[in-house]
From Swiss-Prot:
It is found in: Periplasm. This is Periplasmic trehalase. Its main location: periplasm. Its EC number is 3.2.1.28. It comes from Salmonella paratyphi A (strain AKU_12601). Belongs to the glycosyl hydrolase 37 family. It comes from the Bacteria. The active site is at residues 319, 503. One of its GO terms (biological process) is cellular hyperosmotic response.
Length: 570
């Protein structure tokens, strides 16, 4: 008799093969114009490869406060010629590296500081920011690290001068709330273009981001557009949804239990789940010096291993967090690739459900059933392997130690967000989040103070939205509204004082931007703008919408939870 776990594995394997059948990844070519992605030219190389020792020397010389500056610089002529000139000149007496860079490169311009009109409400400020944050890059310079896109798009702001994958979904929520459905459609079209061009959506539209993706929110983007355009949007983007799924599942057909390949893992019982992965194992061009220093701080590990784990953490969007580290105080203990993240697998469950819905809309019932079967298999795997029964919350799985991890993070809310959680478990997650993560200014990312930006005391807009939506999905409205009210109060207090919205917030109090990480606090800020607009509509009745957060808590909101949230722990 065949053991049940082997039988499940065989059936799952057949379902995956059927679902992926006929889905071809076309890694189309780059050109300086966002043209037909089926044209055949070479994939562009990132600046650390194009410029070799020159890139390394400039970054190590720390000519610019931000390592991203030179990664975004545009060569004024063929990089091979610039590199040849550099090799000829660098050992000459009086050689000035900064002068050489200034002559041979066009540096990115500092963004003009936006000064909003006086007296604007929060909503008016955000609506006024959309055109300020909008970019159009149909054509780029020949050796630019920027990748062209066919339609205009909204950037996060600050040092982030390009489009970012998972940021954009939360930005699009705000665009839709402001009535800019044309911009939503343009951004979905851009991501569809990237999938056709590169086989996946890169971290951002830069050559140095092509080796990884980010949390897969494309299905949510298409579902959002479908709210406005109906099932036509699902049918239009079904091919791109299939290609993205093929990217995440690449290599699964040949995996044996206990094996991993790039982004996909097969556990010993045959369950198929996913992890974050970057195809390269070198320092990130945009954080070159920092990555080299991190690798040098732990000589007991191969530098390439650390580099890939740093890059893979960037793919997760949580760069960086104690979630990925053995020692929260030592970044070089990061091991992202040995961790199966609960949020990633919840998002891929949503992708499988969206594929089923889109296939049904296109009239392919057989394919819809296959994707539904894959979603059901993933849901069972999440419940079996990504639930910490001892602690009472969803968590990540540790491949290295073959066990569930104990740490509670805001990622525990993702199964609720995609409606993949068992009801009794959702109640336990709500209680845990309220007891351990809820702070005066919103939901903390974790309860650990590591100095990393995706840890306490920071709270991030996308995680507030995921939590609020997920909790409401399971009737946990009191906690959902508490997260919403506290975070909005934080945003409003910061705006009242500084007249801006920022990338992240310190949720241990209200009115303070977050800290930690590799770069100063950024303002703008795309996903905060989007989530703020959506949350304003949660706290104010439709018949009387509010343009700012009320000074007193609306009576329509539930009372404050009786349990006082605990302070973040060291």
């Amino acid at each position: 008799m065949i053991p049940p776990e082997i039988r499940r594995s065989v059936l799952l394997q057949k379902a995956i093969k059927l679902a992926l059948a006929g889905t071809l990844l076309t890694f189309a070519s780059f050109s300086a114009t966002a043209a037909d992605p089926s044209s055949d030219t070479e994939t562009p190389q990132p600046p650390d490869i194009l410029l070799g020792p020159l890139f390394n020397d400039v970054q190590n010389a720390k000519l610019f406060p931000d390592q991203k500056t030179f990664a975004d610089a545009i060569p004024n002529s063929d990089p091979l010629m610039i590199l040849a000139d550099y090799r000829m000149q660098r050992n000459q007496s009086g050689f000035d590296l900064r002068h050489f860079v200034d002559v041979n490169f066009t540096l990115p311009k500092a963004g003009e500081k936006y000064v909003p009109p006086a007296g604007q409400s929060l909503r008016e400020h955000i609506d006024g920011l959309w055109p300020v944050l909008t970019r159009s890059t149909k054509n780029v310079e020949k050796w630019d690290s920027l990748l062209p896109l066919p339609e205009s798009y909204v950037v996060p702001g600050g040092r982030f001068r390009e489009i970012y994958y998972w940021d954009s979904y939360f930005t699009m929520l705000g665009l839709a709330e402001s009535g800019h459905w044309d911009k939503v459609a343009d951004m979905v079209a851009n991501f569809g273009y990237e999938i056709d061009a590169w086989g996946h959506i890169p971290n951002g539209n830069r050559t140095y981001y092509l080796s990884r993706s980010q949390p897969p929110f494309f299905a949510f983007m298409v579902e959002l557009l479908a709210q406005h355009e109906g099932d036509d949007a699902l049918k239009e983007y079904l091919p791109q949804l299939q290609k993205e799924y093929a990217y995440w599942m690449e290599g699964v057909e040949t995996l044996q239990p206990g094996q991993q390949n790039q982004r996909v893992v097969k556990l010993e019982d045959g369950s198929v789940l996913n992890r974050y992965w970057d195809d390269r194992d070198t320092p990130r061009p945009e954080s070159w010096v920092e990555d080299i220093a991190t690798a040098k701080s732990n000589p007991n590990r191969p530098a390439t291993e650390i580099y890939r784990d740093l890059r893979s953490a960037a793919a997760s969007g949580w760069d960086f967090s104690s979630r990925w580290m053995d020692n929260p105080q030592q970044l070089s203990t990061i091991r992202t690739t040995t961790i199966v993240p609960v949020d990633l697998n919840a998002l891929l469950y949503q992708l499988e459900k969206t594929l089923a819905r889109a296939s049904a809309a296109a009239g392919d019932r057989a394919k819809a059933s296959q994707y539904d079967a894959l979603a059901n298999a993933r849901q069972k795997a999440i419940e079996m392997h990504l639930w910490n029964n001892k602690e009472g919350w969803y968590a990540d799985y540790d491949l290295q130690n073959n066990k569930i991890r104990d740490q509670l993070t805001a990622a525990a809310l993702f199964p609720l967000y995609v409606n993949a959680a068992a009801k009794d478990r959702a109640v336990k997650v709500a209680a845990a989040a309220q007891a351990h993560l809820l702070q005066p200014g919103g939901l903390a990312t974790t309860s650990v103070k590591s100095g990393q930006q995706w840890d306490a005391p920071n709270g991030w807009a996308p995680l507030q939205w995921v939590a609020a939506e997920g909790l409401q999905n399971y009737g946990q409205d009191d906690v959902a509204m508490e997260v919403t009210w506290r975070f909005l109060t934080n945003v409003q207090h910061t705006y009242d004082r500084e007249k801006k919205l920022v990338e992240k917030y310190d949720v241990s109090s209200t009115g303070t931007g977050g800290g930690g990480g590799e770069y100063p606090l950024q303002d703008g800020f795309g996903w905060t703008n989007g989530v703020t607009l959506k949350m304003l509509d949660l706290i104010c009745p439709q018949e009387k919408p509010c343009d700012s957060v009320p000074s007193t808590r609306p009576a329509s909101l539930s009372a404050t939870p009786t349990k006082t949230p605990s302070a973040a722990t060291q």
